[in-house]
């Protein structure tokens, strides 16, 4: 892989943050130093994801997708696409980088061919409500789509069939995730509840079956994201209640609560905890919040190890990749 020394792509750890100040910032994770800032002029950034080969980062915003080069300091996007209506809320990649998926407020999830330099939309999955989240099953053959009507759709990419679940009617699904072992699926919603299912099937031609496992009253306010750890032992949930909570998947008990609440009774709210990402060894987690900061926490102790300051407005999304390619 051709990475120039001193570029983001040459660093074994890629940490990027973005949000409402129209910039994407790249950080040296261990020092907290901002190493590169990309101006993302057209809109806020709703979602960020690094390509599997660590060569590019996708930034999804209002009516567009921009992809920036990680192996050079080129300030301009190397791939741009503007043909989607409304906000794009979610973005991710097939594990070998052949295609990208997105979901957004135009009520569609889309698959994009990445093998040519101009993004080609290959397939569209239409639902009846704006889409908040899309995640890919580890089998790379099913997309989980969560929408604002409270539905979770399982779109089988091989057969084009889809199944639908509605844990709470008319309560918006804000995030869904499947753990790397494909043992569990979690989804959080706008009332703060987290639902967990056991997964079976999903191998070969078998369709994934979801068996309800538990409902966690995770937060008292809007939940914004849920993420399993790479070792599948933990589940993190982020919320408008200023916390990120970490749950053990062995029994879904609370292990650690990470809070940005002020100890000062007179101080107003520091805002929402928008998103999170675990480190590859599952020992650390980075959070993004609307007090303009990202933070690196020790999962076990809940201690803040580093703060990443520089954004002028809320940080609502991040990408964290510390897996070194062999």
From Swiss-Prot:
Residue runs in coiled coils: none
Recorded consequence of changing residue 313 to R: Elevated assembly of mTORC2 complex. Decreased sumoylation
Primary location: membrane
Effect of residue 192 to D: Abolishes interaction with MTOR
Residues recorded with modification Phosphothreonine: 51
Keyword terms, alphabetized: Acetylation, Cytoplasm, Isopeptide bond, Lysosome, Membrane, Phosphoprotein, Repeat, Ubl conjugation, WD repeat
SMART domains linked: WD40 (SM00320)
Any single GO BP term: cellular response to nutrient levels
Molecular function (Gene Ontology), one example: protein serine/threonine kinase activator activity
Tissues and organs where the protein is expressed, per its UniProt entry: Broadly expressed, with highest levels in skeletal muscle, heart and kidney.
Cellular compartments annotated: Lysosome membrane; Cytoplasm
Linked residues for Glycyl lysine isopeptide (Lys-Gly) (interchain with G-Cter in SUMO3): 86, 215, 245, 261, 305
Highest taxon in the source lineage: Eukaryota
Gene3D superfamilies: YVTN repeat-like/Quinoprotein amine dehydrogenase
Record cross-link Glycyl lysine isopeptide (Lys-Gly) (interchain with G-Cter in ubiquitin), residues: 305, 313
GO cellular component terms, A-Z: cytoplasm; cytosol; lysosomal membrane; nucleoplasm; serine/threonine protein kinase complex; TORC1 complex; TORC2 complex
Record has Cytoplasm as a keyword: yes
Glycyl lysine isopeptide (Lys-Gly) (interchain with G-Cter in SUMO1), cross-linked positions: 313
WD repeat spans: 1-37, 40-80, 83-122, 126-165, 168-207, 218-257, 268-309
Post-translational modification: Phosphorylation at Thr-51 by CDK1 promotes ubiquitination by the SCF(FBXW7) complex, followed by degradation.
Record-listed N-acetylmethionine modification sites: 1
Self-association and partners: Part of the mechanistic target of rapamycin complex 1 (mTORC1) which contains MTOR, MLST8 and RPTOR. mTORC1 associates with AKT1S1/PRAS40, which inhibits its activity. mTORC1 binds to and is inhibited by FKBP12-rapamycin. Within mTORC1, interacts directly with MTOR and RPTOR. Component of the mechanistic target of rapamycin complex 2 (mTORC2), consisting in two heterotretramers composed of MTOR, MLST8, RICTOR and MAPKAP1/SIN1. Contrary to mTORC1, mTORC2 does not bind to and is not sensitive to FKBP12-rapamycin. mTORC1 and mTORC2 associate with DEPTOR, which regulates their activity.
Job of this protein: Subunit of both mTORC1 and mTORC2, which regulates cell growth and survival in response to nutrient and hormonal signals. mTORC1 is activated in response to growth factors or amino acids. In response to nutrients, mTORC1 is recruited to the lysosome membrane and promotes protein, lipid and nucleotide synthesis by phosphorylating several substrates, such as ribosomal protein S6 kinase (RPS6KB1 and RPS6KB2) and EIF4EBP1 (4E-BP1).
Family: Belongs to the WD repeat LST8 family.
PANTHER family named among the record's database cross-references: G BETA-LIKE PROTEIN GBL (PTHR19842), TARGET OF RAPAMYCIN COMPLEX SUBUNIT LST8 (PTHR19842:SF0)
Protein name: Target of rapamycin complex subunit LST8
Designated gene of the protein: MLST8
